[in-house]
């Protein structure tokens, strides 16, 4: 399955600024097919979310049970990939986007810099192309990715160095998530709990829906932080 590149204004949930991802596509999630073991749902996932030790410090980010649970289903095929490990190895420096979002990096208008100032823009773009190639080859139907990441973020990322004395967040996607979105793939984050609830209704007929689950953009932190604009200061 090969997806044509979509203009940003055709991508759902991007608000007034097409380069800023604001919400998940719940309509799409509700239309997902019911998978079977013979024809499993193909989900691309940030490898760190499944317990693989590919975090920047060589540890896994396996603290999200709502994502780890996907490993238990025979009717789900997980395609696990860490773009930063692919491009820069593990362990590695932490990196963030400076001067825009992942879309801006793809357009040559922003850079990816490590905490020590090394420019990793080229490597990150190459990693995004590798992730896109994998998604197309495997015909993935959804991507579940690590938010905040300069590579995999889909709702919120840092605006500049996350280790700055006054850290700043912004609404937007990381480089690899932006690459996938531009080519028609749907992306949700590990913090989009309402969207994950919809996903589980498709793969588990016995799943009891948590009606109080909300997505990242619906949290009090998000609403308070971004209420006056797309950037701000504070802790999450």
Regions found by a protein language model. Name each.
Residues 3-61:
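Active-site and ligand/interface coordination hotspots across diverse enzymes
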Residues 21, 38, 106-130, 166-236:
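Divalent-metal-activated hydrolytic enzyme cores
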Residues 53, 89-90, 151-155, 196:
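Short catalytic/ligand-binding loop motif for oxyanion handling, primarily in non-cytosolic enzymes
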Residues 48, 146-150, 192:
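Short, well-ordered beta-to-alpha junction loops that form the rim of enzyme active sites
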Residues 63-113:
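Short, surface-exposed acidic-centric catalytic microdomains
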Residues 139-163:
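Internal, conserved structured core segments that host functional sites
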């Amino acid at each position: 399955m090969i997806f044509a590149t979509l203009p940003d204004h055709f991508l759902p949930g991007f608000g007034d600024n097409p380069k800023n991802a604001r919400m998940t596509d719940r309509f799409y999630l509700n239309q997902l097919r019911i998978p079977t073991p013979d024809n499993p749902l193909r989900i691309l996932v940030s490898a760190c979310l499944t317990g693989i030790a590919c975090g920047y410090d060589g540890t896994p980010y396996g603290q999200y049970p709502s994502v780890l649970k996907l490993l238990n289903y025979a009717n789900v095929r997980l395609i696990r990939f860490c773009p930063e490990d692919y491009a820069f190895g593990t362990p590695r420096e932490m990196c963030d986007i400076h001067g825009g979002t992942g879309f801006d990096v793809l357009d040559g208008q922003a850079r990816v810099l490590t905490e020590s100032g090394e420019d990793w823009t080229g490597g990150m773009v190459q990693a995004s192309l590798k992730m896109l190639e994998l998604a197309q080859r495997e015909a993935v139907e959804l991507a579940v990715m690590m938010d905040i990441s300069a590579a995999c973020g889909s709702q919120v990322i840092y605006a500049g160095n996350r280790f700055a004395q006054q850290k700043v967040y912004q609404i937007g996607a990381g480089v690899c998530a932006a690459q996938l979105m531009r080519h028609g793939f749907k992306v949700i984050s590990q913090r989009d709990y309402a969207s994950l609830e919809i996903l589980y209704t498709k793969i588990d007929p016995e799943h009891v829906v948590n009606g109080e689950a909300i997505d990242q953009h619906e949290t009090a932190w998000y609403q308070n932080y971004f209420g006056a604009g797309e950037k701000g200061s504070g802790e999450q």
